Regions:
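Glycine-rich, highly charged phosphate/nucleotide-binding loops
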Residues: 43-48
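Active-site PLP-lysine loop of aminotransferase-like
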Residues: 122
Length: 691
């Protein structure tokens, strides 16, 4: 089995040096703006060029994160960012939005394109779809088991990258809106405030309004370092360390540990644990142990351990790691009046230097001493990998040790300088497409999403343009409704759910349904013959990504709920667009169950609540018990736009019902049909912000 790339975080220049000096094969870093860690130090275009030169000189690749959702007003700036990455000579772009992918392929097609974990790709068909879209690598969701990772690796035509150490988001990446709707800072836009680390308490017996105290949404850091050999065997091409917001010492400690395990050597487990943990680590997802032991918080004892471990970790990157093989060629000698030393690497770089001093006849064989002098490469990234000696007439002769040392230094300095030369990617001319704006002021048609058929009032079904139901409810939908019913596919499909979903679609092909709502790129591969609409999971926020999905056969799409009305107006891809007009927004989609902190699945009624520090209750629903199930955490206050429907610049307004009773559904639909104000507490979400 081949050793995977060790990919380390570089949140700033110091962390970059620590990652490289401790042995990372590649680093990932953010260009200022457009990356999922906007609060990291990040790099300007000039700093990026310097970083690439530094890394490439040492045989280290640079992956640049442009992995946030973008709005129409930002597309020109994003195109400039792609040009900056190409000019810097970086190796790859990590992209989330399909607009970013399109810009990379249009502007700098030789740049490698990696599908961010924010795309929520986690299945074999998802990897195949990214390959079809032009991606060179898929970065899998963190929630997968070893068996699921292996299945993707075996099926994937492109490289597979997995996270192996660092912070675990509670939500599936790309499917979290908690920070945006609770604090106005979108994780999908690189500004997550980490609200899941605050108290969200699943404990029973809390009095109404009593603040929650337990942090039941806070997962321990993941640690798959002990499992690296298994991941290598599974076919993983790159193992990624999370942590651009952490310290250089953290990066060095984890990189060093990964290198040791990949080489079959022991590593300092205590140092890895002490440099950062949240009451220890978890490998629950990888090993199929989805239980309460996955959760933990950062304690004062953890912080004290980090302070104590930091000096030791700092020693790991005090000096250059000698990793770049250098081959020497030596010629000339006494009769030639000097010697010529050539240094070359395996990448085709070659430099030559000449002795300033004239050699004198040697009393003994000088070659052993010459080899010792040329092998002293400490303090450089080079390691001697052979000497080809071709002495002239009279032999090499004698030169003092200082002269050989100076020759070596001069040769290696020149070779390092040559390796540091940046090779930009060719940039193609690209004119940003223009997109029409959506008309404002027209009344959108009404559609509604229901959790099940019993929740939908018969009289409302006749008045709504579309009815949307989970595909699991298909058989219970009355035939009279099917002509206007769209079957909603799952946003995530763990275990065997992808195969089951594809099989169910095949079985329902001729059952009279109006279409299917796709929520993951994977689903584009097994929905042939269906009229397709894009759902919440596609995260469409701009006209370029909307147009790309339309070109892939999507005939209408729900815009991402964080999108402000002004940004929505710019999304008019030539197919109908939709926006939520009512609903308790799904703030998180999780595989780990927060309720497992207080009870096991056998004692669970299929859901529960979480109490935050302000005394508010967040409903949690569960699709199935165990690791195959998905939990959804809902906002306690519903979004409502009933009396402002004309302000939604879309064709269809969608009311999303979850746990409401049929009677309550009827009341809310009446308010919407009559454009009436809401009858209880509500929110306008982020529609009127300038996000």
């Amino acid at each position: 089995m081949s050793r995977p790339e060790i990919l380390a975080p570089a949140g700033n220049r110091e962390m970059l040096g620590a990652a490289v000096f401790s042995g990372a094969d590649a680093v990932y870093l953010g260009l200022t703006g457009f990356n999922a860690r906007r609060t990291a130090g990040n790099f300007t275009p000039d700093e990026l060029r310097e970083a690439v030169a530094f890394c490439h000189a040492r045989g280290v690749k640079v992956h640049v994160t442009l992995n946030t959702l973008v709005y129409d007003r930002e597309l020109s700036g994003l195109a400039d960012a792609v040009r900056a990455v190409a000019a810097a000579g970086a190796d790859a772009v990590i992209a989330d939005d399909l607009a970013t992918a399109q810009l990379v392929k249009s502007i700098a097609p030789t740049l490698h394109l990696h599908g961010s974990t924010q795309m929520s790709v986690h299945t074999p068909e998802g990897a195949k779809e990214l390959a079809a879209l032009g991606y060179d690598r898929v970065i899998l969701a963190r929630e997968l088991s070893l068996e699921e990772i292996r299945a993707v690796c075996e099926a994937s035509p492109i490289e597979v990258e997995v996270f192996v150490h660092g912070a675990l988001c509670m939500s599936v990446s790309g499917q979290c809106m908690m920070s945006a709707f609770l604090g106005g800072r979108s994780g999908n836009r690189g500004a997550c405030a980490g609200p899941c680390r605050l108290p969200f308490d699943a404990s029973a017996g809390l009095k109404p309004g009593q603040p929650g105290r337990a942090c039941h949404l806070s997962l321990k850091d993941m640690d798959y370092i002990p499992h690296l050999r298994e991941l290598m065997d599974a076919g993983v091409a790159s193992v990624k360390i999370e942590g651009r917001l952490r310290t250089p010492e953290y990066a060095a400690a984890v990189v060093t540990a990964c290198r040791a395990v990949c080489a079959g050597q022991p590593y300092d487990e205590k140092l890895v644990r002490d440099i950062f943990s949240r009451s220890g680590f978890t490998d629950g997802y990888l090993t199929n142990r989805n239980d309460g032991k996955m959760f933990g918080v950062r304690t004062e004892a953890d912080a004290a351990a980090t302070r104590a471990a930091t000096p030791k970790a700092r020693e790991l990157f005090r000096r250059e790691l000698q990793r770049v093989p250098v081959h020497y060629e030596l010629s000339g000698g006494v009769e030639d009046g000097g010697v010529k030393l050539t240094a070359r690497d395996d990448d085709g770089h070659r430099v030559s230097v000449y002795s300033a001093d004239e050699p004198q006849p040697a009393q003994k064989d000088p070659l052993p001493g010459i080899e010792r002098a040329l092998g002293k490469t400490g303090g450089t990234p080079f390691v001697m990998d052979g000497l080809a000696a071709e002495p002239g007439e009279g032999g090499f002769g004698f030169l003092p040790g200082a002269a050989w040392n100076e020759l070596r230094r001069e040769a290696l300095d020149k070779l390092l300088e040559k390796r540091s030369e940046v090779t930009p990617h060719a940039v193609q001319a690209f004119e940003m497409p223009t997109y029409p704006a959506h008309t404002v002021g027209q009344l959108p048609a009404l559609a509604a999403r229901f959790a099940n058929a019993a929740q939908c009032p018969a009289e409302a079904a006749e008045k709504l343009q579309y009815l949307i139901f989970p595909i699991t409810e298909a058989e219970s939908i009355p035939e009279a409704w099917r002509g206007k019913t769209l079957l909603e596919l799952p946003r995530v499909m763990f275990g065997r759910l992808e195969q089951k979903t594809a099989a169910r679609l095949d079985a329902l092909q001729d059952a009279g349904f109006a279409g299917a709502v796709v929520n993951n790129p994977a689903q584009l591969r097994y929905t042939d013959g269906w009229t397709l609409y894009g759902g919440l999971g596609l995260n469409v926020t701009n006209p370029m990504s909307a147009a790309r999905y339309a070109s892939l056969g999507v005939q209408g799409m729900l815009l991402q709920p964080e999108t402000a009305l002004t940004a929505m107006q710019a999304v008019a891809p030539g197919v109908p667009t939709a926006a939520l007009c009512y609903g308790h927004l799904p703030l998180m989609l999780t595989r780990a169950c927060p309720l497992r902190n207080v009870r096991d699945c056998g004692k669970c009624p299929g859901g529960g609540t979480l109490r935050d520090r302000k005394g508010r209750d967040f409903t949690v629903t569960c699709s199935a018990s165990g690791g195959a199930g998905v939990r959804t955490v809902f906002n306690p206050v519903p979004l409502y736009m009933g009396e402002r429907l004309r302000e939604l610049p879309v064709d269809v307004a969608v009311a999303a019902f979850t746990t409401e009773t049929p009677a309550r559904v009827s009341q809310i639909l009446d308010l919407l049909f009559n454009a009436q104000p809401f009858d209880s507490e509500f929110t306008r979400g982020l529609y009127y912000t300038n996000n």
